[in-house]
């Protein structure tokens, strides 16, 4: 099933690119700047030169204070659907104590096939690209990026980086992070490095038997779709991918959820109330009014602190 997911991701990227990116002559599916802008046109903020949405650094900092529950927004089709928060769990987490926030830079691989690879590599060389491998995308990373890779759950040969390239990713992204639906190698060497990382497995093999199919197009990670430029938030629980056009509203909502939890625990500390009298919403009108006043005060304090 995992391998089929990877093929579905590739097929989706390929079908999009066959219509949208005829200029991608190296058989690497990607978007032109105009296509990137068109397919992310709901975002009206700043962009990178390639058109990828660039959410503000301040939002990355805000997200570090949020839990998965606080940023999770129900949508059409169930929790995480409807174009809101896209959550994926069941990871091995390198540093559970670290929060990960950044902007998604996407890569997708597919299982290698010799006859296709010969054509792909030949066309890449015609464009001056020596090799379409993991380093092709890694070398494009910017500060604040999180590298998000669909390696279709591949274990042996699905090792997107070892310790040397992990170190490079950490330096290039300024510690942004790595999410790979695949594996790592050199875990002993990687473990001391202070960058968040989410992966499925480990294996001592070098990356192999996989062909780079797409860079900075929509990809599938588990059961969610990730777009280039998504706000990525990871903690010990899992990873959420937030469409940039929804990110500020979700962070504002998360502030209110955080304050509600804060107030709830303060009332529990008083020892006067049953849980059902306070959580999830206070029953007593006087308590509801007290909460609204507390919420207003704390929001003003939080907003004032962010202006400093």
What are these regions (language model features)?
Residues 66-68, 80-228, 241-308:
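Feature captures the catalytic cores and cofactor-binding loops of soluble hydro-lyases/lyases
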Residues 27-71, 76-79:
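N-terminal pre-domain segments of enzymes
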Residues 15-23:
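C-terminal segment of classical bacterial N-terminal signal peptides
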Residues 1-11:
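Bacterial N-terminal signal peptides that target proteins for export
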Residues 51, 169, 230-232:
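Buried hydrophobic positions in well-ordered alpha/beta secondary-structure cores of metabolic enzymes
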């Amino acid at each position: 099933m995992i391998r089929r997911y990877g093929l579905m991701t590739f097929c989706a990227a390929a079908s999009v690119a066959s219509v949208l990116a005829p200029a991608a002559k190296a058989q690497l599916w990607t978007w032109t700047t105009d296509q990137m802008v068109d397919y992310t046109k709901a975002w009206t903020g700043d962009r990178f030169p390639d058109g990828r949405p660039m959410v503000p650094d301040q939002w990355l900092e805000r997200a570090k204070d949020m839990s998965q529950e606080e940023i999770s927004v129900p949508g059409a089709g169930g929790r995480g659907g409807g174009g809101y928060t896209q959550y994926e769990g069941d990871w091995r987490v390198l540093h559970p104590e670290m929060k990960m926030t950044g902007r998604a830079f996407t890569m997708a691989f597919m299982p290698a096939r010799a006859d296709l690879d010969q054509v792909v590599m030949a066309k890449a060389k015609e464009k001056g690209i020596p090799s379409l491998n993991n380093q092709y995308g890694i070398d494009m990373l910017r500060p604040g990026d999180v590298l998000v890779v669909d390696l279709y759950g591949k274990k042996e040969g699905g090792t997107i980086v070892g310790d040397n390239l992990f170190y490079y990713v950490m330096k290039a992204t300024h510690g942004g992070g790595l999410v790979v639906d695949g594996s790592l190698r050199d875990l002993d060497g990687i473990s001391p490095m202070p960058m968040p990382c989410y992966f499925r497995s480990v294996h001592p093999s070098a990356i192999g038997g996989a062909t780079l199919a797409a860079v900075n197009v929509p990809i599938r990670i588990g059961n969610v779709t990730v777009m280039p430029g998504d706000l990525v938030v990871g903690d010990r629980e899992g990873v959420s991918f937030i469409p940039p056009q929804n990110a500020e509203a979700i962070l504002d909502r998360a502030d209110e959820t955080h304050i509600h939890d804060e107030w709830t625990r303060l009332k529990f500390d008083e020892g006067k109330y049953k849980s059902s009298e306070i959580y999830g919403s206070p029953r007593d009108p006087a308590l509801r009014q007290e909460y609204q006043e507390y919420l207003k005060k704390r929001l003003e304090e939080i907003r004032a602190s962010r202006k400093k």
